[in-house]
Amino acid sequence: MSQQDKKLTGVFGHPVSDRENSMTAGPRGPLLMQDIYFLEQMSQFDREVIPERRMHAKGSGAFGTFTVTKDITKYTNAKIFSEIGKQTEMFARFSTVAGERGAADAERDIRGFALKFYTEEGNWDLVGNNTPVFFFRDPKLFVSLNRAVKRDPRTNMRDAQNNWDFWTGLPEALHQVTILMSDRGIPKDLRHMHGFGSHTYSMYNDSGERVWVKFHFRTQQGIENLTDEEAAEIIATDRDSSQRDLFEAIEKGDYPKWTMYIQVMTEEQAKNHKDNPFDLTKVWYHDEYPLIEVGEFELNRNPDNYFMDVEQAAFAPTNIIPGLDFSPDKMLQGRLFSYGDAQRYRLGVNHWQIPVNQPKGVGIENICPFSRDGQMRVVDNNQGGGTHYYPNNHGKFDSQPEYKKPPFPTDGYGYEYNQRQDDDNYFEQPGKLFRLQSEDAKERIFTNTANAMEGVTDDVKRRHIRHCYKADPEYGKGVAKALGIDINSIDLETENDETYENFEK
């Protein structure tokens, strides 16, 4: 039956006799509580909004196909990469970070870049951003980042003072802040930006040899960005500009593509690497660890229903497949818990049964989880009436030892180690990034920073100028000039191991 031919029913199939007139006592009288369709409709409506994501709330998504173009089987035995030309169905969700569901797409902000690959060995989620680094390297700061970039508890407004007080309280944040204040801080749309796995992951092959890897996704559409002025004009007329661009491009057959690359570092190279190779505030230089092409993905199908496929999409870095593994990256380790936990709160314990999250490459009929029950357990018959314990005499829930991973390298005793004693090289990489910019691009960094710091107190501005100066004197002087602050009035010699308590007041 076509959608047009369907007649109105309640959620349990009862025919609805009148959808416009409530049941009342007399033509003008009060409503009767026996108008079951009215009660059902309103109670359903009252509950139809689910909790929004704590970060990355405003998002757009599409389905597509990943195709292997180069052989990397010497690094990994993951079946998704097993042969050139192999294709895997996938889903991608892009997002802003700080804004709520109704936020404007063209804001200066990081963009989420989350990919879900439906492989024959289970779902692989790569939960990244459009930047290769992050503001900090210890997950204990996650909650504070959320509060600093979200709404102030007193005014209920976004507050630049909170943003910059937090960011400048962490000297290691300068690398990410520099990217955010650069031209790439406002992508023109979702199709014209790169993506990054950001974290360090690992791969292992049939011989159990492990290498550390970083994932890169380079847009085949080219990089295009917006100035602050261009973004303001777009926001004034279209708050959904990026979502509209992606949807309309796919709808008319202009399918966007990205090329997947990896950087590879051996375990021996990691031991001798200048910096901590698992530090999320730093990159691996391409001249030392060149990009290796892997494949490409194309987004070629829009969701039929936004709520079903985009709002209910659940990504978690714990969704990883044989041949791929984690690393000692503290931020990645923290996300291994927080993402799945957030999805269980937002969508329920059985969110894996929602169609967009199901392991399509395996087939829902072939999975055999030990979990049972819980709200909305509907898809797999709750494992039926079969054995629900282990060990048992029926061979159910037997392990698959052939998928055992190689030993994971660790080092040291459990302790709350001071990260600043381990590494205080905060400014080398943002300095190099700044020097890579053209003169015009540098000027835009200065101007964008001044625009973003409007209303911020002088002590926080001076703190940021000092960090910029340590990265490169020209950087610090340019930001100071844009902010109208005399560079000579700032103590530029504060020690590198400064902490929040030691900042000048």
Swiss-Prot record:
Q: Which residues form the active site?
A: H56, N129
Kindly indicate whether the keyword Metal-binding belongs to this entry.
yes
**Which cofactors does the annotated protein need, by name?**
heme
Write down the species.
Answer: Staphylococcus aureus (strain NCTC 8325 / PS 47)
**Protein name as catalogued:** Catalase
Record-linked InterPro entries: Catalase, Catalase_3, Catalase_AS, Catalase_clade1/3, Catalase_core, Catalase_haem_BS, Catalase_immune_responsive, Catalase_sf
Q: Where is the signal peptide?
A: none
| Assigned keywords, A-Z | Heme, Hydrogen peroxide, Iron, Metal-binding, Oxidoreductase, Peroxidase
* SUPFAM superfamilies named in the record: Heme-dependent catalase-like
Q: Give the catalysed reaction(s), semicolon-separated.
A: 2 H2O2 = O2 + 2 H2O
Stimuli inducing this protein: Induced by hypochlorous acid. Positively regulated by the ferric uptake regulator (fur), in a Fe(2+) dependent manner. Negatively regulated by PerR.
Sequence segments annotated as region (Disordered): 1-25
Q: Which gene encodes it?
A: katA
- Please give the subunit comment from the record: Homodimer.
